[in-house]
């Protein structure tokens, strides 16, 4: 595409612009028109987005005959002021601007306008917009901003910032409005129509005034303002001492809204509330004063209970007859509702429920039929329960414990038994030998210990039971019966007898040593208990014999 054509594309201000095809297909090779610093825009011209379209200057377009085909230039300082503080930039020109309700409708008339070369810009000097100091300044080239459309348009555009300027200033292009449910009382301050409020107020004061202006209809036909926001024009200074009184509340509410007659009086509202004594009489009873010893405890509990009620008035508990009667007003209908009794019954019911839930299984002994025992056991087949006694007996003997005592006839039959070894008829326990014969307890133990039958010479006619420790026999621990049966143990043993039993001969020793039996033991013999008598012996022989005896006894022990 050849862009070197003689046709030039310019804005209505005379400013050349790129064709749409040049922006998409390649770079622009055409020539820009010359710069004319004396050019100004007509006041009647209200531009819109249509001004961005390219226009052929050879077809009697607007400003085609202007001298020098002047371009529009923008001042950087004015541009910065315009973008940063838009309302302030137009404060100086608001009276000279001619507002247009429909800017785009004026554009169709520009083709019929005829500009003469002789007139140059004389007609433009009388334009309202030309008189402003904003567009008479030096304008930077190659800038595309539709100033006339922004200044003359009253239509709203949903672009930030969302704020308003106070009347009679022109609102910014951002006028995002919301509909409020109730008409505001202070809408005139913002320059809105009815039932419209800014979405984002410009300052904190606007936010407070907007909330303070919201009114709510009541049944009495009056408006009750939102007391949570104070108007910045009439601040209310509250004191700590008088802030809670009904009169101060009514005054503060009237100062917030500006009309005290339209507000519901706080004192009238509090006067319609029943007193504490009336409210207590209608409260359901929850305790009885009969359960307390003194009236002081009842008063203290009443004060605690009154905290749960509405705090409209202070009760007078000091009076006796005119005010609350502790035992006449509240105790009526409260009989039988003592808290202690209720707690006891509740605990008893809970305990009963727990006992029912934790009821133990009732076991019965399979053998003897008892229901109580320190420990329940089971039979060998694990099918039945046994008490502790029957379980131990069954575990030891493999049979059930007998329930009836032993018959005396069976004991009489045992009296006819005779030991097969010693022919004894009395014993503490009858046993069986390895051949199956009945033997006494002594013969049975001896045969089990030594592996052969007990000698008949060891038989004794009287049954003696073993006693552990020192017995009644004295230091030796032997009873008289044992000494009578075994006289050898009670006699002293001479040294000659000891030597002869060991195969030693000592003709020179005659009745020289006598050894007594040590208590409780048979082999524990020492020289301390030996009684030696010397007749006529050499010392060397005696020492030698003593060493031999000591060695023999040490080996035997």
UniProtKB/Swiss-Prot annotation:
Residues 234-258 are annotated as: Disordered. Pfam families: GATA (PF00320). It is found in: Nucleus; Cytoplasm. The keyword Lipoprotein does not apply. A zinc finger (GATA-type) spans 365-390, 419-443. Induction: Translation is induced by amino acid starvation. Translational repression during nutrient-rich conditions is dependent on several uORFs (upstream open reading frames) present in the 5'-UTR of the mRNA; these promote ribosome dissociation. Translational induction occurs in conditions reducing translation machinery efficiency, leading to ribosomes scanning over the uORFs, and increased translation of the mRNA. Disruption phenotype: Decreases the mRNA level of genes involved in amino acid biosynthesis. Increases the mRNA level of genes involved in the response to nitrogen starvation, including genes required for the mating response. Decreases vegetative cell population growth rate in low nutrient conditions. GO terms for biological process: negative regulation of TORC1 signaling; negative regulation of transcription by RNA polymerase II; positive regulation of autophagy; positive regulation of transcription by RNA polymerase II. Keywords: Activator, Cytoplasm, DNA-binding, Metal-binding, Nucleus, Repeat, Transcription, Transcription regulation, Zinc, Zinc-finger. The keyword Repeat applies. GO terms for cellular component: cytosol; nucleus. Residues 243-258 have a biased composition (Low complexity). One of its GO terms (molecular function) is RNA polymerase II cis-regulatory region sequence-specific DNA binding. Activates genes required for amino acid biosynthesis and acts as a master transcriptional regulator during amino acid starvation. Binds variations of the DNA sequence 5'-GAT[AC]GC-3'. Functional homolog of the S.cerevisiae GCN4 and mammalian ATF4 bZIP transcription factors. This is Transcription factor fil1. The lineage of its organism: Eukaryota, Fungi, Dikarya, Ascomycota, Taphrinomycotina.
């Amino acid at each position: 595409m050849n862009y070197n054509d003689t046709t030039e594309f310019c804005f209505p201000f005379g400013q050349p612009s790129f064709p749409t095809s040049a922006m998409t297909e390649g770079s622009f090779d055409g020539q820009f028109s010359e710069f004319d610093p004396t050019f100004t825009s007509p006041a009647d011209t209200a531009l819109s987005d249509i001004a961005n379209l390219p226009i052929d200057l050879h077809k009697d377009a607007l400003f085609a005959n202007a001298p020098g085909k002047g371009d529009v230039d923008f001042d950087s300082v004015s541009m910065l002021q315009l973008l940063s503080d838009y309302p302030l930039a137009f404060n100086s020109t608001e009276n000279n601007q001619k507002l247009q309700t429909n800017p785009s409708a004026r554009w169709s008339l520009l083709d019929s306008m005829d500009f003469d070369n002789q007139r140059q810009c004389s007609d433009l000097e009388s334009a309202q917009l030309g008189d402003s100091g904003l567009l008479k300044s030096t304008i930077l080239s190659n800038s595309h901003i539709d100033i006339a459309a922004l200044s003359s348009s009253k239509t709203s555009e949903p672009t930030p910032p969302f704020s308003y300027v106070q009347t009679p200033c022109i609102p910014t292009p951002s006028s995002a409005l919301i509909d409020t449910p109730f008409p505001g009382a202070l809408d005139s301050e913002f320059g809105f129509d009815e039932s419209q409020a800014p979405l984002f107020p410009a300052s904190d004061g606007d936010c407070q005034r907007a909330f303070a202006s919201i009114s709510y209809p009541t049944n009495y036909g009056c408006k009750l303002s939102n007391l949570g926001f104070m108007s910045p024009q009439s601040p209310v200074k509250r004191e700590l001492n008088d802030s809670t009184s009904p009169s101060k509340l009514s005054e503060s509410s009237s100062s917030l809204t500006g009309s005290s007659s339209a507000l519901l009086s706080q004192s009238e509202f509090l006067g319609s509330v029943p007193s504490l004594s009336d409210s207590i009489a209608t409260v359901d009873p929850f305790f009885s004063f009969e359960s307390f010893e003194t009236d002081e405890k009842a008063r203290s509990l009443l004060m605690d209970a009154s905290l749960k009620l509405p705090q409209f008035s202070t009760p007078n508990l000091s009076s006796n007859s005119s005010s609350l009667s502790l035992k006449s007003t509240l105790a009526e209908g409260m009989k039988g509702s003592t808290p202690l009794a209720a707690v006891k019954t509740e605990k008893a019911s809970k305990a009963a429920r727990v006992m029912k839930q934790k009821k133990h299984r009732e076991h019965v002994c399979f053998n003897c039929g008892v229901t109580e025992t320190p420990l329940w056991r089971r039979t060998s087949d694990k099918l039945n329960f046994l008490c502790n006694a029957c379980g131990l007996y069954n575990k030891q003997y493999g049979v059930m414990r007998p329930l009836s005592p032993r018959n005396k006839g069976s004991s009489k039959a045992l009296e006819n038994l005779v030991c097969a070894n010693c022919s004894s008829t009395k014993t503490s326990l009858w046993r069986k030998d390895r051949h199956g014969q009945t033997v006494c307890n002594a013969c049975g133990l001896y045969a089990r210990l030594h592996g052969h039958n007990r000698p008949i010479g060891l038989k004794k006619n009287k049954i003696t039971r073993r006693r552990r420790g020192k017995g009644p026999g004295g230091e030796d621990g032997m009873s008289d019966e044992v000494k009578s049966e075994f006289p050898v143990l009670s006699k002293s043993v001479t040294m000659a007898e000891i030597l002869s039993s060991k195969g030693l001969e000592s003709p020179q020793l005659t009745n020289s040593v006598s050894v007594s039996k040590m208590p409780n033991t048979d082999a524990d013999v020492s020289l301390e208990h030996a009684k030696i008598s010397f007749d006529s012996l050499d010392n060397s022989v005696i020492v030698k014999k003593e060493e031999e005896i000591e060695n023999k006894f040490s080996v035997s022990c």
